[in-house]
Amino acid sequence: MTPDKDAPLREDIRLLGRLLGDTVRDQQGAASFDLIERIRQTSVRFRRDEDLAARRELEDTLDALSREQTIQVVRAFSYFSHLANIAEDQHHIRRSRAHLLAGSAPREGSLAHAVGHALDEQRLDPTDLAAFFDTALISPVLTAHPTEVQRKSILNCQTVIARLLDERDRMQLTPDEAEANLDALRRAVLTLWQTRMLRPAKLSVIDEVNNGLSYFETTFLRELPRLYAALEDRLAGAQPALANHELPAFLQVGSWIGGDRDGNPYVTADVLEEALAMQARVALDYYLDELHTLGSQLSLSQGLVGASDALLALADRSPDQSPHRSDEPYRRAIAGIYARLSATYRNLLGHPPARHAVAEAEPYADVAALADDLDTLHRSLVANGTAALARGRLRHLRRAVRVFGFHLAPIDLRQNSDVHERVVAELLEVARPGAAYLAQDEAGRCALLLDELATARPLASPHVRYSDDSEGELAIFRAARRAHLRYGRGAIHNCIISKTDDLSDLLELAVLLKEAGLLRPLEKALDVNIVPLFETIGDLENAAGVMDRLFSIPVYRELLAARDQTQEVMLGYSDSNKDGGFLTSGWALYKAEGELVEVFGRHGVRLRLFHGRGGSVGRGGGPSYQAILAQPDGAVQGQIRLTEQGEVIAAKYGNPEVGRRNLEVLVAATLETSLRRDGGDATPRTFLDTMQALSDAAFTCYRGLVYETPGFEQYFWESTVISEIAGLNIGSRPASRKKGTRIDDLRAIPWVFSWSQCRLMLPGWFGFGSAVKQWLAAHPKDGLGLLQRMYREWSFFATLLSNMDMVLSKTDLAIASRYAELVKDPVLRDSIFERIRSEWKDTVDALLAITEQVELLDANPLLKRSIRNRFPYLDPLNHVQVELLRRHREGNGEDARIRNGIHISINGIAAGLRNSG
């Protein structure tokens, strides 16, 4: 009999649910517990048995709740969503370990599979494979967004619960130990219940920085070095000559938090400098803690083990001259390193670390000097027969120092091209009266900008007071220059231009960088990457042409030499989706990448794509492994950056082991895609033409609803939680770029998040059904067969449909209809919702026909089971949220308890959906 692999997951969910129920009974009373349990059982009965009587009973019960009961129900089911996520993550870890323990073949997405595939199937020499990483860069980039609803305090509680579940899994506990573990779990669930889920005040940028840093403390600082070590060991196992080979720092975690100014007036030069200091503190604290522990471990006596001359000299320079450690050169050397790093801490941050050094010492001039001292320790251990000791904590510390430096994570700077344009126009008007920059056409603007880039003379005068906008932008770039001098050039690598639509947008940024000394024309030096961000459908279509013209400018090609002939380009998934819909956005991105590959190849420039993906499929989300493998040939080549946004950061990196697995997936997918034999399986012309036809039809359908239907904006604002999201203290950035209700002005993130909350997920599928219907009508004989072949043979199309499959499985039209009832105009409500319902049915029918499934997610039974297990806990939250929205709006939003309940429900639904923003 085949064992039920999901039984432990169900046991964990039952255990956590029981502990939460006990907590509710103890804290709120038996009546509250009985009510919540009745709602849960009714919801389970409806979902499990498709019992329509149970659905009516559920709706009647929820509609009859008092205000106080409503809040308790919302809290209980929201916390349960979080607990279910913890149990699910633990089950992923459990299954991965079981797979390894069974000696099974490596799974797709693992380092073992990727390396084995390269060596065995592609016949790559291990030395050549190691060389691949010499020029590679793989970087997930953390961003703060208006949908990140997790509080750090909640994350801390969840970490404790996850650790205790893991303990139950891995250890053979005695009865007393098992009882102690259960008591600890009970306390942790109680703490979670009594921890406020919402913030009392709106999040500041510094709060967001703190939130982001928690993932470095729990996951990245420890797991990245282990991943590097595992990869090096695997290469050494394949080629003994690589036994001592150390890979360069090709895998790094970046951040936008503290540097993303696009639409966020609260990101200033002062905030950037504070964010950099906070990051440095986390990195240095970690190094100091590791050195302290290393000093206690390396108690090696010179009478028993040798030491190199360099190590002895390092020990002699140490301020630790205690006679008790006179024969322990490794300990004394470590004490000296600690003292110098402690002085560095004080030098960079203005105060000493919590644990003082044995004595004063000179600070390190840069991180390379610290790395050199650690290398001296390493070489001495290896040369004197104690290489095993060099491969433990010291190995991980050396790797951490090389990856994280003194800056922890490079912070990207980002600003809208319109802002750069205004600043440059003002600077030119003062320096060159009559230049009339804004009145110039594109050619005139470029000529003026290239004139400025040909001279070292700055535009800005210290004797002129410019507008606040201009002063603020110049201050940011000057702060970036200071950061390079203080923390090293790794602190800020990239300056990103949002809404890039022409060549002048890139040259404007170049001129502003020159003002701060980050671009120095006479030296042909450029200290940061100038990164265009192409976001709308039109901009994506023009991207290759813009880059072609840029590379034709001699002065820019000279500057690229300072960046190793590598040019980064960012592609925006979110805005292109809001602009043209899911299908057209995906296709426009795919085509843009292929065109960029051709242009970059022709100019001999290395392309690095930065994918601005969100958590939801409507914003480019979905499994990273499949997404990377589905890239066009030549679009990766060892170079890839991608954003990690919203609640996805917590889901991917909140648990260290899950975080390690997600980092592995990025490396594995990048390796496999980069080493794929380019051009061997060119996409058939018929596939491309069909995709274009589908895209055109889907675009017309999507734009027809969202931008051309009278009253659609009213429908959206009244039938979703968009108004309430704007008031939720979950991000420092406003939900809209401008005041008003225009869809054009709304940020893509709350747009998608709002549709997810009401269980329509419209940005992740709308338009596909109509497009396929039109295609089949025009090709009645062979149309479906061709689409099925595209699904089987073209990874891009298969990934697109796989993501849509997942999105559609989370939709619920019955629940969505409850939200539609919030629309005051019945004619508007019925007409728009009926269009959505009809398109949803056409889309589901089309998807099932093409994928040859009977039900959604038949091809992914694990995900199907996971999502279905969530519905009984999500459904009550959605029903209660609708009722709270009705009461809130009827009462003009004056009841703080109702407002609080809405915000908790938003949190719980986001947790239950996992990738909604």
UniProtKB/Swiss-Prot annotation:
InterPro entries: PEP_COase, PEP_COase_bac/pln-type, PEP_COase_Lys_AS, PEPCASE_His_AS, Pyrv/PenolPyrv_kinase-like_dom. It catalyses: oxaloacetate + phosphate = phosphoenolpyruvate + hydrogencarbonate. Pfam families: PEPcase. PROSITE patterns: PEPCASE_1, PEPCASE_2. Signal peptide: none annotated. GO terms for cellular component: cytosol. The active site is at 145, 578. One of its GO terms (molecular function) is magnesium ion binding. Its cofactor is Mg(2+). Keywords: Carbon dioxide fixation, Lyase, Magnesium. Forms oxaloacetate, a four-carbon dicarboxylic acid source for the tricarboxylic acid cycle. HAMAP family: PEPcase_type1. Belongs to the PEPCase type 1 family. This is Phosphoenolpyruvate carboxylase. It comes from Azoarcus sp. (strain BH72). The lineage of its organism: Bacteria, Pseudomonadati, Pseudomonadota, Betaproteobacteria, Rhodocyclales. The gene is ppc.
